[in-house]
Amino acid sequence: MQDYIKNVLKNMPNGWLTTTTHRLDIYNETLAKTQFIESLETLCAKNNFTHKALGKLPTAYDYIRLGHPLSCLLEWGIAKTCNLDSKSVISFSSKTIPLLAILRQNALEKKNTRIIYTHEQPNLKHLEVLKQVYGYTFSLKRVNIPEIIDSFNGSTVFMTENEDIATLDLHENIDFFVTIHKRLGSVLLVNGDHNQSYISQIQHVRRRESIAMTPVNCLVALQNLLHISVKEIPTTVKANKAAVLSSIKTITGTNTKPLVGSSGLSIQYAIMMGLVDHAMEHHKGKAIKFVVPPNCYGGTNDQARRVAASINCVEVVDLPVDGDNDMVQSLDAVLKQIAQQDAIPYIIAEIPTNPRVEVPDLDMLTKVLSTSRKTSSGEKAIAPVFILDQTFCPNVHFIGEGAVLSSVKAIAYASGSKFPSAGQCTAGYCIANKKGDVFTSKIALHLELCDNEATDLQYEILAKHLPSMNQRIIEAYKNTREFVSFIEKVLPQAKINFVSKALATQGFTPSVFSLDLPTKGNTAQERETYKRGLNHKLIKAMITQIPQQSKYCVSYGQLKGCYWTIPATSTQGTTKENDKDYIARVSVSANLDLERHKEVFLEFVKSM
């Protein structure tokens, strides 16, 4: 087995190390966690490790933060070494999230947790925060020899720091083994049939609140597993981090402290938990309401509901923003309701909206956010905090001094896997305005507690690409506007959602638009079925006729080419079906053969 993995590493596709989002035309969501390994095992049985064969393996997950070929290979290799099923081995970039995932599930099931360690006490600096804010209960115990661990009424988690990440002796009284590697992350082993139900829950925590061990770090861990000596490469992480923080301040027009996480959802989780922590400390006993668009992309929606499910005082409130709904009017109504309840309103929203790419009246938005409201008893209600997902337009100045949201408490964040890194890594960042800076220390605390800060390589990639981001956005917008104008000309009956030229002059220059193709049929179901078929016909034409540039991918802000995806709202399987929008979302880059894309689109129109 070890010889086979060595040969796989020698012949693996380059994309295993560099790809951040994968082709959905070779991706089956229901088989995302198993299909890659099953296909790899078939190759292993034939001792086939050719570059061509490895390149034909099905996609492992749709984003690398959920998992990727090298994390699958690492988990499979460790599982073989420990005589486990590969699904019982889960790798993380974070050193603490595996434990937090177990604690979360046990808290929901009201089950005891015992944490056992052989080295120094686990690096959980904020044990009281875990108990008071997250609501987790646990006991700590140090042992010198693992063999003397007794049975326990609940879950026993054994934590150890070890450079050789797979050297574990399974013990029947240990339910979960967490091996921590200071530079790479951690690996969790689920022991025993009675703990198999935890696997999907732990994987979902990795999917939503953290990321899998990164491809580069998985490669190092695999080399450790195979006892291949790895040459230390000197890093310039301090310089890279300083450059990234400086770039974020410049881009956002602010001078507060930026925070950088391993993914957009990692940073969003730190924001949410930081605000919950702040509310519990400063507004004891009050309900916390996270106001979230119901059809926003799956990650935000799902994570907000997961936080609400695990913390009693937190609830999610829907904010209708698309279609016939106006964000400002919806927000005004929701804030009145929350004020009456004397609750704490935290709003998470994208501008422009996703997928309809609409921008609300920003002056009216500021007015609604600034309005003083009363509780049902006539007292002054708690002012809202606006958490702005700026991933579509990270170049727009929303929160700097004198900017449109400078007069209200606001925090802006963006997924770095889009424009900031040009799709080269998953890291995300956030920064508050002056009024919102009161929350920064709490957000930083929870980012540290979850060990979700960006990795050294992520800082390096952001340091390289952030300085050119605004120019890339401008050039990508020009291509997008030209493509949209062409589609309007050759297919005028299609409905396109894209920013107006007037909004573009204000700085809203996204390179993403949604395309609602014309349909036909006697019933709503017939029309919807026909439209979905037409969508897939269009995407198939694009990705087969321009395979080097057009991809069936859910991301945007990429360095080159054009990405297409359906449904536009989510491919993650967590947005409620009735809230999904089965229209095409198209992401255009600054670097692509636009004329060829026009040609293929025109051929598609003629074939309709």
Language model segments and positions:
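Active-site C-terminal subdomain of aminotransferase-like
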Residues: 189-243, 411-579, 588-593, 600, ...
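A generic secondary-structure signal marking the coil-to-beta-strand transition
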Residues: 88, 257, 409, 509-511, ...
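Composition-driven detection of intrinsically disordered, low-complexity segments
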Residues: 67, 92, 234-239, 392-394, ...
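Conserved PLP-enzyme active-site core in the AAT-like
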Residues: 5-8, 13, 20, 90-210, ...
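Conserved beta-strand positions
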Residues: 349, 388, 515, 586-588
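Short, surface-exposed acidic
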Residues: 85-87, 253-258, 522-525
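N-terminal "arm"/small-domain region of PLP-dependent enzymes with the aminotransferase-like
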Residues: 1-69, 76-80, 85, 139-239, ...
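Conserved AMP-binding/adenylate-forming core of the ANL superfamily
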Residues: 64-75, 86-94, 259-263
